[in-house]
Design a protein with these regions (language model features):
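Hydrophobic ligand-binding cavity/cleft-lining segments
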Residues: 1-48
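Intrinsic-disorder/low-complexity, polar/charged segments enriched in Ser/Thr/Lys/Arg/Asp/Glu/Gln
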Residues: 12-18, 49, 61, 75, ...
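Short beta-edge strand/loop motif at the mouth of beta-sheet-based domains
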Residues: 16, 36-73
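Hydrophobic/aromatic beta-strand elements that line small-molecule binding cavities or substrate pockets
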Residues: 19, 51-54, 76-82, 93, ...
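A short, structured loop/turn motif at beta-sheet edges
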Residues: 25-26, 56-57, 81-87, 108-117
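Short beta-strand segments that buttress and anchor functional surface loops
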Residues: 62-67, 90-96
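Short, solvent-exposed aromatic-acidic interface loops
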Residues: 69, 94-99, 121-128
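A conserved amphipathic terminal alpha-helix motif
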Residues: 125-159
């Protein structure tokens, strides 16, 4: 598996994202938890990411903003739950353009002989919230993020 797979089963308030990366899980974990690396891969290619806060610890808050070419901003925030590790990065996720529609994301990283299988499960409060996320065009950002992360991991391993 080298492409990002997105699964959103009808009637279930959940989105599952999986992708295998050609990099060790510790490096994939670092890319998920180091804000200097996060800005290099998270989100659509045509948006700039600014990380305002990223406290990777139990109860730690995070906040980042995507900015498009016209200067429009799209803010997101949440809180980490438990101590983030390659076994589980658990956090809430809320788009500031639709307050009150919080989802819980759990990302696991499984090492596979120098490669890493990433599995991210987003659980929504309702099927309607999940459907609104799917309808928002999130697939483009998810696919771009997967490609950009693979490119970043290749650069980090080459240096």
């Amino acid at each position: 598996m080298s492409k990002t797979e997105i699964t959103a089963e009808p009637g279930i308030p959940m989105i599952i994202i999986t992708r295998e990366f050609d990099a060790p899980r510790e490096l994939v974990f670092r890319a998920h938890t180091d804000p200097d690396l996060l800005v290099q891969w998270l989100g659509p290619r045509d948006l700039a990411l600014t990380v305002d806060q990223y406290e990777v610890r139990n109860g730690g808050a995070w906040h980042y903003v995507n900015t498009d070419a016209e200067g429009n901003t799209y803010g997101f925030h949440g809180v980490f739950h438990g101590d983030p590790s390659p076994d589980a990065i658990v956090q809430t996720f809320e788009f500031e353009g639709a307050p009150g529609h919080v989802c819980l994301q759990s990302t696991t990283l499984a090492g596979r002989g120098g490669k890493t299988l990433m599995r991210s499960v987003s659980s929504f409060q309702s099927v309607e919230d999940r459907d609104a996320m799917v309808a928002s065009g999130m697939e483009r950002g998810v696919h771009d993020s997967g490609e950009r992360l693979a490119e970043l991991l290749a650069r980090l391993q080459a240096s």
